[in-house]
């Protein structure tokens, strides 16, 4: 006996069996083992080998036994004696069988059949088998270690389980019918949940098994039929029928899923259907020929159900009766699919026919017409009809009987309310009306223009409207060109030109109007009879640091009443000065504009509302970029220019050089025979200021500036901001008419009543005449600087106009927030674009506008600035919340925190940056954008080495080198040049100095170099060493 010990797992390898199978054999032979690592004697091993050989010959049945015993503990040798009591093990076997069917249909079919055999035998033993074993089936879906060992039908004839073969075939037969004929598989389902899983269980294995099974299925399976007889969701099953039936059985797992779904739909449908079914059996026969493929097979299995239908002989008739109403019920959803005109009449006719239980082919033919509208909606309606058939038929009978006169139709529409939901009827009629309207609209199509003028970027929708084509047509054209666009996306001018070429429309690029150009004429025809002289509005313009504000301060200090405490605080950018000219007291209103390049829009606005432009040029600095820009603004606005050459008291001042430079821009001094007045002044010393003021008044007289003070005020918003105490505050320049406290004012989209007015000296005033600049309180919102304002007599009219303008503004803001196609399409397709979210709060609207304009100048090809909010006013807790939600940075320019905002920012961890110099703000944001850019790899040279000798080493070679310049570093990148050409690029793998490994070798030393992938060294080769370093990119590179 004890010739030697053998471990179970070694024996399993030798016999090419699983450990579990071997343990099962040990159980059968009463060999006591605990696990696969237990040892047995050689003689026991021999007996196992013999048993394994028998297994190999009859592997089907052995597998069955193995499956049965695989869940038993191997330590009990008495397990094999208990084997003949299968009923005790039934549930365990079922658990093994069901999941295998669901998952591995091909490989596990035989095992499933074996399980079925055992179920069948259990059925033979117990009189009412379906319920006891149906309940364990449902929880078994997820479990299943399935073994993918292919086995064929050879199992069935080999073991004493031969008599069980027939029940197996029977069990598979219903399954096949359940899958292939959804209408029938659903029929048996209405009632008890315990029985639903059975058809699902058996369904999948029948597909992969060989054809023989089909024959055995057909031959008869009364035993298992009852389970299939239940019918539940007819509608879904027949919907499945509409799709190709052959495709569904082909998929094992997917086919089982629909069966489960079919078990769920409304069970309430079953009862009314049964009522109609019994008498409708003959009509069902009439419909039956539509499925000629397997009539006999279907009839046989469904014939036997003991679902309370007595007699197997009546099975076929009962079956067809059950199917016939199915079909009728199924077809019920289709009538709404007919042409829209006769829907109601046809539905009622169909319901009458169901009531009479007569399946008429004519009606059926009508129903086959294709769907026009939403079939799901109609089907739901008809589901409700099916539940209420008895009541609805009585109502509709009297109406549906007459032929089809229009009167009857209208009557039926009224009384057939319970049958077809009125809401959907209304929807459909409204659809019809809409369709008719659309047709009428399309008939009045605009002709496509031959030429269009474009000033800037446009959305696809706007372009489609301009070119009189469908927006989808433009999207299609661009898609064919490789550009994916949406209807609301902005297209730039080159893209618009491309679309125009495709549509054969000439696209002209109209030059955008200069911002400084005067758009609206403030004086109307009715004012001509009432015009009076008004003070001139003078804008001081020039380059930054050329002394504009100093000049203004100097004029004010000399001309403002000396009694004012501490001089005048400049509340607003516009103020007036009283001077005596020709013995009369006259006024001049000055506007101060910033000189920094960011404030272009402000300068343009100043030029637009002004009458005379004073151009300040420093005598020591000459004409600068903003000087040129100011000249162009004034010329675009068509206002006369008076040049003040400032800083003549400084050393190095060259007034004549300034005059010379100005001639290049069309400004020639009167002294030199030109028309431009040029006055040399010193703002600090106050030299020649009176001369400058006199010249301004002289030019004003020539211009004959006039306005009508007896009308409602009109003018322009110079500046606006949000004050925490006063609310929205706007600085208005009145250009015509007179403004009173209490007037209804509309500025842009901001509407309000003038509550108070404050002049430039801080005094409250009740009346402001032409050319006056005042601060106005009482507006509902902060208007944009540069908006025109107007006073209305009718408040309702003003409100309506304000609402309309607000909508337009909102739309334009949305369009601006959208990125244009060219800047984004390529990057968006390659990868995610990086964005910097900003919330910008400034002291006044003009500052905010200037900052936004500057930020737009920063290149944004790879990183985008996304302005979530730009407004004038304090930084509030609302801003902090918005920043926290969107991950934005808050930029504050010359503004403060509202109470509680700073603490909220600290708690939320929001980054708030405060600035009072615009240069610094722009630099910081540009730096933040550069930080978002991916750093680029740049080659940094290390040194140059010459090969002096080559030493063969093994299969390769080592180069003896001399470092001529720089250094060599191990693992650096090298480039080998021979006769000026690069012959190899790679990594320096080995570096030695005097037989020792070296990390680096400096210039003037010799060393040995080895490269794994290159051995073709030659004396005189030059080795260039370099390394790749990351370098921060700048936005200039992304242009």
Curated annotation (Swiss-Prot):
Residues 592-595 are annotated as: G3. Residues 157-176, 408-423 have a biased composition (Low complexity). Residues 646-649 are annotated as: G4. Residues 567-571 are annotated as: G2. It holds the Pfam family EF-G_D2. Residues 39-347, 400-452 are annotated as: Disordered. PROSITE patterns: G_TR_2 (PS51722), IF2 (PS01176). Residues 533-706 form the tr-type G domain. Residues 178-197, 226-243, 432-451 have a biased composition (Basic and acidic residues). GTP binds at residues 542-549, 592-596, 646-649. Residues 103-125 have a biased composition (Polar residues). Residues 542-549 are annotated as: G1. One of its GO terms (molecular function) is GTPase activity. It is found in: Cytoplasm. One of the essential components for the initiation of protein synthesis. Protects formylmethionyl-tRNA from spontaneous hydrolysis and promotes its binding to the 30S ribosomal subunits. Also involved in the hydrolysis of GTP during the formation of the 70S ribosomal complex. PANTHER family: TR-TYPE G DOMAIN-CONTAINING PROTEIN, TRANSLATION INITIATION FACTOR IF-2-RELATED. This is Translation initiation factor IF-2. It comes from Nostoc sp. (strain PCC 7120 / SAG 25.82 / UTEX 2576). The gene is infB.
């Amino acid at each position: 006996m004890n010739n030697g010990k053998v471990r179970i797992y070694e024996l399993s390898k030798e016999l090419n069996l699983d450990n579990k199978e071997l343990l099962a054999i040990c159980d059968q032979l009463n060999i006591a083992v605990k696990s696969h690592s237990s040892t047995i004697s050689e003689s026991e091993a021999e007996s196992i080998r013999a048993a394994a050989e028998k297994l190999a010959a009859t592997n089907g049945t052995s597998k069955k036994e193995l499956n049965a015993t695989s869940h038993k503990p191997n330590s009990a040798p008495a397990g094999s004696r208990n084997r003949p009591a299968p009923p005790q093990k039934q549930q365990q076997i079922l658990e093994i069988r069901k999941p295998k069917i669901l998952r591995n249909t091909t490989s596990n079919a035989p095992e499933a059949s074996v399980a079925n055999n055992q179920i069948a035998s259990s059925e033979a033993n117990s009189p009412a088998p379906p319920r006891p074993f149906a309940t364990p089936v449902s929880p078994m879906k997820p479990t299943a270690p399935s073994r993918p060992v292919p086995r064929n039908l050879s199992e069935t004839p080999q073991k004493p389980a031969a008599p069980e073969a027939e029940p197996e075939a029977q069990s598979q037969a219903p399954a096949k019918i359940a899958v292939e004929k959804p209408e029938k598989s659903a029929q048996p389902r209405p009632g008890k949940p315990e029985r639903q899983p059975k058809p699902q269980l058996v369904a999948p294995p029948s597909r992969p098994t060989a054809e023989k099974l089909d024959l055995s299925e057909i031959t008869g399976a009364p035993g298992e039929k009852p389970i299939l007889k239940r019918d539940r969701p007819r509608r879904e099953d027949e919907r499945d029928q509409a799709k190709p039936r052959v495709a569904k059985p082909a998929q094992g797992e997917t086919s089982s899923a629909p069966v489960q779904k079919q078990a769920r739909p409304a069970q309430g449908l079953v009862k009314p259907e049964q009522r109609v079914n019994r008498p409708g059996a003959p009509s069902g026969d009439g419909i039956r020929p539509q499925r000629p493929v397997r009539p006999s097979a279907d009839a046989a299995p469904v014939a036997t159900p003991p679902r309370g239908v007595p007699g197997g002989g009546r099975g076929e008739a009962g079956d067809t009766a059950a199917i016939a109403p199915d079909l009728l019920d199924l077809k019920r959803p289709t009538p709404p699919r007919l042409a829209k005109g006769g829907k109601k009449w046809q539905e009622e006719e169909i319901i009458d026919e169901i009531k009479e239980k007569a399946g008429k082919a004519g009606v059926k033919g009508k129903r086959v017409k294709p769907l026009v509208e939403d079939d799901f909606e109609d089907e739901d309606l008809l589901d409700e009809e099916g539940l209420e058939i008895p009541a609805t038929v009585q109502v509709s009978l009297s109406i549906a009987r007459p032929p089809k006169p229009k009167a009857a139709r209208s009557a039926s529409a009224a009384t057939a309310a319970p049958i077809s939901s009125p809401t959907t009827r209304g929807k459909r009629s409204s659809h019809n009306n809409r369709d008719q309207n659309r047709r009428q609209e399309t008939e009045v199509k605009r002709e496509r223009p031959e030429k269009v003028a474009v000033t800037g970027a446009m959305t696809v929708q706007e372009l489609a409207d301009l070119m009189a084509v469908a927006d989808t047509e433009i999207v299609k054209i661009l898609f064919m060109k490789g550009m994916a666009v949406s209807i609301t996306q902005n297209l730039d001018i080159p893209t618009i030109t491309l679309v125009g070429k495709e549509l054969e429309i000439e696209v002209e690029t109209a030059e955008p109007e200069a911002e400084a150009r005067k758009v609206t004429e403030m004086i109307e025809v009715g004012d001509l009879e009432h015009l009076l002289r008004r003070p001139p509005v003078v804008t001081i313009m020039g380059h930054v640091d050329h002394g504009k504000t100093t000049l203004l301060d100097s004029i004010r200090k000399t001309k403002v009443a000396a009694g004012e405490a501490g001089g005048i605080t400049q509340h607003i950018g516009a103020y007036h000065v009283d001077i005596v000219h020709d013995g009369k007291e006259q006024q001049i209103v000055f506007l101060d504009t910033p000189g920094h390049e960011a404030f272009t829009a402000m300068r343009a606005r100043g030029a637009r509302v002004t009458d005379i432009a004073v151009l300040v040029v420093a005598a020591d600095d000459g004409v600068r970029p903003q000087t040129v820009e100011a000249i162009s603004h004034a010329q675009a606005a068509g206002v006369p220019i008076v040049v003040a050459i400032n800083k003549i008291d400084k050393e190095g001042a060259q007034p004549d050089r300034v005059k010379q430079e100005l001639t290049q821009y069309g400004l020639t001094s009167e002294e030199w025979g030109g028309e431009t007045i040029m006055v040399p002044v010193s703002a600090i010393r106050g030299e020649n200021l009176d001369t400058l003021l006199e010249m301004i008044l002289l030019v004003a007289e020539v211009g004959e500036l006039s306005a009508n003070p007896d009308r409602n005020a009109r003018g322009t918003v110079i500046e606006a901001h949000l004050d925490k105490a006063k609310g929205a505050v706007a600085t208005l320049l009145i250009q015509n008419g007179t403004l009173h406290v209490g007037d209804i004012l509309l500025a842009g989209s901001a509407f309000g009543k003038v509550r108070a007015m404050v002049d430039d000296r801080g005094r409250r005033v009740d009346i402001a005449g032409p050319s006056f600049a005042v601060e106005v309180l009482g507006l509902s919102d902060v208007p944009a600087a540069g908006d025109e304002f107007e006073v209305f007599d009718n408040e309702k009219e003003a409100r309506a106009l304000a609402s309309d303008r607000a909508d337009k503004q909102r739309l334009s803001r949305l369009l601006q927030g959208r990125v244009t196609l060219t800047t984004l399409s390529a990057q968006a397709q390659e990868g995610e674009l990086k964005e910097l979210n900003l919330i910008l709060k400034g002291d006044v609207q003009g500052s905010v506008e200037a900052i936004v304009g500057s930020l737009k100048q920063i290149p944004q090809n790879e990183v985008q600035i996304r302005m979530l909010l730009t407004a004038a006013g304090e930084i509030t807790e609302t801003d902090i919340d918005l920043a926290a939600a969107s991950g934005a940075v808050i930029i504050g320019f010359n503004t403060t925190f509202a109470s509680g905002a700073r603490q909220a920012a600290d708690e939320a961890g929001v980054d708030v940056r405060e600035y009072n110099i615009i240069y610094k703000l722009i630099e910081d944001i540009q730096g933040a954008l550069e930080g978002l850019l991916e750093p680029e790899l740049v080659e940094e040279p290390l040194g140059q080495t010459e090969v002096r000798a080559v030493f063969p080493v093994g299969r390769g070679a080592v180069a003896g080198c001399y470092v001529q310049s720089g250094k060599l570093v191990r693992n650096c990148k090298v480039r080998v040049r021979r006769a000026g050409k690069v012959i190899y690029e790679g990594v320096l793998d080995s570096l030695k100095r005097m037989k020792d490994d070296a990390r680096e070798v400096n210039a003037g030393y010799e060393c040995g170099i080895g490269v794994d992938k290159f051995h073709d060294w030659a004396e005189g080769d030059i080795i260039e060493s370099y390394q790749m370093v990351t370098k921060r990119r700048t936005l200039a590179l992304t242009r």
